[in-house]
Amino acid sequence: MQRNHIVKSLLITGLFTTSSLPLLAAEAPKNATAATQQANNLLYNQLPFSDNTDFTDAHKGFIAPIPQDVIKGEQGNVIWDPQQYAFIKEGDKAPDTVNPSLWRQAQLINISGLFEVTDGVYQIRNLDLSNMTIIEGKEGITVVDPLVSAETAKVGMDLYYKNRGQKPVVAVIYTHSHVDHYGGVRGVIDEADVKSGKVKIYAPAGLLEEAVSENIMAGNVMSRRASYMYGNLLKPDVKGQVGAGLGTTTSAGTVTLIAPTNYITKTGQKETIDGLTYDFLMAPGSEAPSEMLWFIEEKKLIETAEDVTHTLHNTYSLRGAKIRQPLPWSKYINEALNLWGDKAEIILAQHHWPTWGNDNVVKLLKSQRDLYRYINDQTLRMANQGMTRDEIAANFKLPSSLANTWANRGYYGSVSHDVKATYVLYLGWFDGNPATLDELPPEEGAKKFVEYMGGADAILQKAKQDYDQGNFRWVAQVVSKVVFADPNNQAARNLEADALEQLGYQAESGPWRNFYLTGAQELRNGVQKLPTPNTASPDTVRAMTPEMFFDYLAVHINGEKAADAKAVLNFDFGEDGGTYKVELENGVLNHTAGVEASNADATITLSRDVLNKIVLKEETLKEATDKGDVKITGNVEKLNELLGYMDNFEFWFNIVTP
């Protein structure tokens, strides 16, 4: 198991604790059944496996390999192992336990190194989940999206310097607000150079707020689910994790963030960055809440961030996130096509590999544009015919012109869950049938389900027959009821695990495979409580506004315990943070900026720097108070009372069991 890769994925996670916990003896994964082998083999006749264009493009411009040394942290923890996917070899036929289409994608994303995209534009691939792009200009270099971790980003820069010479970084660009596109920035530049004006950081409007806020309120649950989505609990091998579809996996180093100095605010905004002309296109609410694309005139290059890649992307992330809107997404791509399609010779994204040649550029833009538009429009067409979310997903088919294009295959997103997300985007979770309006909760409903079906043994006997016939979806669905009715029924857990495992072996989507196989692993062996990550890096905490901080506290208030409590507190953060009135009443914590209550129970005075240290657990409130860094006047017990109503979130909560 990869202890050091737990939960870093695409979130604001920070450093791991140093404690080590024992693992249970794990039951080994099983082989692919005949039904799974048959399902996977059918794909060879359905998809154009003879088309090797992507492999040619993925190798084009190769300069140097990624260093093969394991990247480790100060405590010896593995941050990135370049050899962990060495079992995925280009040219090998897919194993029985991996969907052939996903295997092909895994081979492609495993192609790593420093590449020349065009004269003066270079890209480092497979040193993290995302790519890092380096653009040579008049005075130095501009770095686009410095990976997840400072450690991997530094190795990437060293690789570039070794092959292209030492050049000063004059600018950094964040394409959007996800952590794999800014987290390694301190491995690329020094913040002092940003403050002095030596280095500029460009970003789309709203990036800093979105980077901090998107995951922080639901950070614990999103991180736990991310451990499923990215397969961080699985061993990388042919019966385990083979990649995430978007990249191989995430690094497990230090997430950093330096605030942008220059914001792009509107489509058509042009900036000269180190002698090159950038024409920007805003794309908020597409793949990320804050995102932008651009065209470099001198290079005839479209940078599509993460809106045009070599996969059907998520319009909903299985780790949990706000639903993304396929219609605006499609329109942004159409706008890029109309603005630059007649002159672009290259499409470059921050995942996967570039596309060269105007005809190919236009073809890819049109195909991805129509992919997201088709999902939007046809979901609504079918919904307007009275079909429900699950009925639409079960009957939804892309036209062959879209479905048989490799770049549109569901390696990260999937047609099924993107369609369901689009339904929920417009119509919400309720399907309109009053029988589903107030269903029993999972455990209670499962017990009645098992009772009505004649008991667990009867269900398992029938389910085993369905398993032998290859009906794995139904087996997983029905046996999950038995597990939720009696989580100690190991026979049920094992049968559900077997079914999930076969579904994982058949899955084309990397996240689907990872969810299935992680669920199977936890059903068989229980939840392995590995070292727990902090859910916010120091830079993320420092970037939180006071409003975000108080909202974060409010999420931790146990409303039932605090239902009858009342407290009014003033917080004074000084010149760098302002004053806030905080009120606890009706189990709710409200705050008001710029106001001090005359009837406050207590006033807490501290600097923003001290607040950051307390949030990061670098010191306790008591320690800071004893040192005089926190001053409390009034009724101290009211503050203690408020803090006593706050829940601590258990990270390793159950997912496949109650």
What are these regions (language model features)?
Residues 25, 471-477, 484, 488, ...:
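Feature captures hydrophobic
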